[in-house]
């Protein structure tokens, strides 16, 4: 079964750089709305892992999952305090979050089944189509379309957008 890993920082550090939204209440509302979206998207089920690295209480999200859940969409939660300094940037913290999630939920992750990492506040409107049409036996599935200056041709930029990325 496919796994959706929804990453979150509900209450970001006051010194976190480059945040467009820092209010925990607003962020929590967006995380809740996105979680409900993934719980109610039509089609076959998937396992949802919701992982927050700001040690924020997840009662609101647990309640949303209980009220909108399906038997074929189990949801598992983890909230912990990140040890990565905010000054190191969002990317470094997110990599640590992914590592923590994969380690913590290792028993729930079927071997060689894809994990779709999604920024937890975002609703990927075509997630069902992406999951249903993913290439067989892929290792990494990422979006390079909307990232400017990718590759050696343009100054060696090898960045990709990691709001949605899948891996096995």
Locate the predicted segments by residue.
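ER/Golgi luminal nucleotide-sugar-dependent glycosyltransferases, focusing on the catalytic module
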Residues: 1-168
């Amino acid at each position: 079964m496919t796994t959706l890993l929804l990453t979150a920082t509900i209450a970001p550090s006051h010194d976190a750089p480059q945040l467009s939204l820092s209010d925990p209440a607003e962020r929590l509302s967006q995380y809740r709305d996105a979680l409900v979206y993934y719980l109610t998207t039509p089609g076959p089920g998937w396992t949802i892992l919701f992982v927050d690295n700001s040690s924020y209480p997840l009662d609101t999200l647990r309640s949303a999952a209980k009220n909108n859940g399906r038997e074929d969409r189990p949801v598992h939660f983890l909230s912990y305090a990140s040890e990565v300094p905010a000054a190191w940037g969002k990317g470094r913290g997110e990599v640590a979050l992914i590592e923590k999630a994969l380690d913590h939920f290792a028993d729930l992750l079927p071997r060689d089944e894809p994990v779709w990492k999604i920024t937890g506040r975002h609703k990927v409107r075509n997630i069902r189509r992406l999951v249903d049409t993913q290439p067989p036996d892929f290792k990494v599935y990422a979006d390079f379309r909307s990232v400017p200056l990718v590759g050696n041709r343009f100054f060696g930029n090898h960045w990709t957008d990691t709001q949605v990325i899948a891996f096995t």
